Amino acid sequence: MSHRLQTDTHFTDKTRELLQKMPDFVRRYIRSIHNATSARTQYEYLKDIQQYFRWLSQTTPTENITLELLAEQTKEDFEDYLEYIEHYEDENQKQRTNGRTSIKRKLSSLRKFFAWLFANDYLPSDEIRKITIPKIAKKEIIHMEETEVKDFLNSIQKGENLTKRQMGYHQKQSIRDMAIACLMLSTGIRVSECAELDVTDVDMQHSCIHITRKGGDESTVYFSDEASAYLQTWLEQRAGMKIPDSETALFLSSRKKRLSVRSIEILIAKYAKRAIPGKHITPHKLRSTFATSLYQETGDIYLVAETLGHKDITTTKEHYAKLSDSRKRDNRNKIKLLSQ
């Protein structure tokens, strides 16, 4: 069974377990989004609904929440809930907090749920729609400059600026780490997408990988000739390792297990810290480095959006607005009027 299928099965089982403690109309809602969302997304939506139900009636089991009770909720009630989840005590008496980004996501989940209830005549109105979605301050896109990319890759390839202890580990894993870094820098894939890759997802003949995006959409992403060379070397090294037939992962840990998202984050940070001190580089910064370079080379924001897997080009435009303005400013004298 592929890792992707294992993940889907895991979240499907968790969703079914949660649904046993939910009223029938929630089960119908989850069923309605089954074909349009991933198993992970369905589970996350359900967790957000469950949390809201627990707050709504703390003495009533979630499966006994009624449509009549939901119909009584006002805009002010929803505002009270959003204020509550900023800082609260969970069912295990642990203190929990949520930042603006998390609150925005939870509100989005509930808005979708209540919109469905209203559209399907379960509720007479959609009060939560009156809630203003919290605005999140836009962060400046941090990316590596061309010289920094070279320093970063040299750190991986040659072990430059590493400690003696790190060098011992580096000699065993440098081929794998170089393949990971080059693949991410030449495709812009997310760290989760990289960690989930199986060997069968790699098509060396056509220089592409097959990935599943957030939301469950499948996509084909092409990598560069440089990345291809390092991937080929890693695949040859992997083929010579004693690995159980059941292990399908492309990238493996020293224990011959699938390399986790956290492990990739740590190895990227390790090399970047030595090569580019003072600049906080994460796998997501590799993604933004790729996107910045692609936009600077092509000027095609639609290509960048499609390659990154953004469903809404507005997201891409917002992130790379400064680059777009700079490009327009640089081209202001391209059209000549009187002078030739």
Where are these regions (language model features)?
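Conserved catalytic core of the tyrosine transesterase superfamily
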Residues: 1-340
